[in-house]
Amino acid sequence: MLLEKNIPFKYVFGKIKYEITFVAVYAIFITVIYKAYELTHINIPFAVPSILGTVISLLLGFRSNQAYDRWWEARHVWGAIVNDSRTFARQLVSFTPSANNYVDSNLEAFKKRMINRQIGWCYCLGKHLRKQRTLQGLEKYFDKNELAYLKQTDNKPAAIVDLMARDLQLALDEGWINRFQQIELDRTLTRLCDAMGKCERIKNTVFPSTYSLYIHLAMMLFIILLPFSIIQFVGMFEVPLVIAISACFLLIEKMAIHLQDPFENKPTDTPMTAIAQTIDNNLTQLYLLNAAKEDRQTLSIFENYIENGIVFDRLDTSSNNRKNKSNQQQKEVKDDQYYVL
């Protein structure tokens, strides 16, 4: 996507270079013929191209609005994907038990697996909409069995959502989350699936080709008639004037054409890869910070127990101390060991 405010002049007019070349050649040809053969009797009233230009302006304005609405809806949907992805990760780390009251390697693997899947889903959806290789470069987010399953499916983003829904049911069966938490997480997945459907609707809904054809034909007619209307007033300046007026209409038309398809891997596209990278950074940081917080909580509780002498005690190596502790506690212990009082 174009992010710079100052777009190069070459880039802008590079989009209409062939059309402008045709207009320039045609305008020069009309000027030469008009002067060489003194075709002053060929005179088209200026009102004709004026009315035609007004109609074209209205049609181009309508088309530009429709194209921008499609582009803005695509950006709005991906903004919702960002929010729901963060919500999903937050729910995962907050709903599931923390390390200080539930220690289970399978639980930690579940949280990491779900967050990796969500990150991979965002990248995969962008590639899916652009009709690229959807799983290329995403091997680190899925294990071998998941990749083998995804390769067998046609709609890989939908298959990833299905994998996450199955894991939510597993978490419910294992007791890692309760029924209410499972419903809330499933609602977030449903919103993500809805966003995917909206993107696919925009992608697969083609802008009416007849509408574009009629506008283009009207513009060509306008360009053909315009030199005959102004050459008698401006003479040789007809060439740059026709080029300038035509360029305005052509640029607006090209802008609408590019905006109407926001998932075609063009500079004017919705920046899906950049958005997915933002989600990747946010979710990875959230998971790592939560894991570090749990480690600190566990260490803090451990140190607190040691300071208060509640759980752990250090045995002395001297025989007297061992005898005293043996009399007091009446328990058999070993040297240089920790034991529970």
Please annotate each region the language model reported.
Residues Q91-S209:
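Structured inter-helical modules in multipass membrane proteins
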Residues M1-F9, L60, V77, N106, ...:
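Juxtamembrane loop-helix boundary motifs flanking transmembrane segments in multi-pass membrane proteins
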Residues M1-A80, S98-Y102, V234-M236, N281, ...:
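N-terminal juxtamembrane/topogenic regions of multi-pass membrane proteins
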Residues F62-R70, R75, G79, A158, ...:
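Short helix-terminus and kink motifs of transmembrane alpha helices
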Residues S85-I119, F263-F312:
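Solvent-exposed, non-transmembrane helices and loops of integral membrane proteins
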Residues W71-F88, L185-M196, I202, K266-M272, ...:
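Intracellular alpha-helical coupling/juxtamembrane segments of multi-pass membrane proteins
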Residues K17-I20, A24-E38, A47-P49, L59-R63, ...:
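Alpha-helical transmembrane anchor segments
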